[in-house]
Amino acid sequence: MKKFTLEVTALSPLHLGAGKADVVIDAEVVHDEYGMPYFPAKRLKGLLYESALELAEISDEALFTEAELKELFGQGQQDGAGFTLENLYLPHYEELRDGWSYLHKKYNGLFREQDVLDSYTDIRFQTMLDKETGTAADGSLHNMRMVDAGTVFTGELELIADDKKSLRILELALKNLRYAGAKRNRGCGHIQCIL
């Protein structure tokens, strides 16, 4: 087993949807109980699989086969994946979490989850245009929270089978993975992955 530190940097605003909304926000980002955003491991693993599958198809399986890819990602197998991945958090997450936890307890009500989240995110507003009039369509105002460009997420990737082929597949998939989250075709979600 080999452990690696994985770093994902948001090169543009990034929406990692939580699937939740409220009266103020139509589309919220995933965040912990203190308001710090994170990159869910399951979502990243799915993106890596799609990225690697794209490479296998483009190279006509010259780089690696689809069977090798499915084995590494544990698809159709009882053994599970050939690597484990944890959620990616902000650098020094434990220290930040402990600090926010202390402030939440010491000054209850003064430091809210929303205030913490606001320091890492921004809210984007958009409307749909009415094609006939060229103006905003009635009732089309929509907003979504975006993680700020420049935000870095780090976490641990553990390669279970210590073989060069598996490592190469992951390295290529990470290099090929350039977009995540919503609004990718609107200039959002551009990321850089470093192992």
Task: Label every PLM stretch briefly.
Residues 1-126, 133-195:
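RNA-binding basic/glycine-rich loop and surface signature characteristic of RAMP-family CRISPR effectors
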